[in-house]
């Protein structure tokens, strides 16, 4: 089951995702990660070369629209490393490493409940 955690408990929550009009804020309700499988401490790539580590797409939902950006390991890996090595390890769904690329059936969800 997905666990909801407050923004203040998230590591690196003050660091904006590098996009002209997109930052992590209290309006962010869901982060959907495509093209990766979480295993151990770091995102593990699919066997498909098109999804070669460390680049992958993140879709951030603000209710209606979804914005797609490419996040590099300078932001995502430290964030996931902290989440997956703390009490928040249950904030993700595992997906098979051999899933088809960009398949809507295979996603990792990180959901946050913002109270501000």
Curated annotation (Swiss-Prot):
Lineage: Eukaryota, Fungi, Dikarya, Ascomycota, Saccharomycotina
Superkingdom to which the source organism belongs: Eukaryota
InterPro entries: DUF468
Similarity annotation: Belongs to the UPF0320 family.
Pfam families named among the record's database cross-references: DUF468
Additional record remark: Contained within a telomeric X element core sequence.
Protein name: Putative UPF0320 protein YLL065W
């Amino acid at each position: 089951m997905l666990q909801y955690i407050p923004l203040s408990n998230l590591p690196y929550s003050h660091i904006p995702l590098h996009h002209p009009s997109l930052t992590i804020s209290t309006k962010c309700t869901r982060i959907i990660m495509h093209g990766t499988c979480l295993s151990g401490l770091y995102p593990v790539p699919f066997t498909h070369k098109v999804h070669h580590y460390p680049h992958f797409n993140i879709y951030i939902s603000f209710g209606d629209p979804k914005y797609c950006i490419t996040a590099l390991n300078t932001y995502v890996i430290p964030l996931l490393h902290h989440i997956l090595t703390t009490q928040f390890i249950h904030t993700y769904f595992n997906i098979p490493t051999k899933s088809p690329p960009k398949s809507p059936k295979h996603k990792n969800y990180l959901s946050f409940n913002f109270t501000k």
